[in-house]
Amino acid sequence: MIHLYFLDCSPLLNEQELARALPQLDDHRQAKVQRLPLAEKKAQSAAVGLLLRHLFGNAEYAYNTNGKPCLADRNDVYFNVSHSGNYVVCAVSDREVGVDVEVGSAIRPAVMRRCFHPIEQVWIGEDSERFIRLWTMKEAYMKRIGSGLSLPPIDIHLSIPPTNGYDAPNACWWYLTQWETPVSLCSECEQLVEEHIVTIKDLL
């Protein structure tokens, strides 16, 4: 099963709320938040720290060669985090999992040429929702396998039009639109997805 957590981090745009959150973060996360120049990025990073603490307590983390985090002392729990705008999402599973959220992204011609096969480009056309759908699905796949951008997105071939379910060997996707912004999930196999709405109030 995949547990998917969806969090609105906008309350942390308030400096007083952010100040309340900081002491509950570990030293590394506090320093990271304080280094970030933009209020939006501070809120996102602090929210990630609060959510991970809520889910995993004071767990130790390790990182693969491309920077994907994992729990250092567990090989039966995997997670992946994404944030955009006011939203943070985290997917937790007993298998490798990738998740991506993207708020209001306009079509970017350079990204289209570099990341999408010509057939995908034709399907997207001028439709920004289709652009976001394919982009988040590709991102979720890259995050699942932990490749970063060492795997060119253009080499990830999706069915057109894309569908939920298996769309490549050892890759199963979900494209979820029931929240304020769409979220893509990718796992190596089909699983049940249990959704959880979390608030900053729950975490403080």
Please annotate each region the language model reported.
Residues M1-L204:
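Core catalytic alpha/beta fold that binds nucleotide/phospho-ligands
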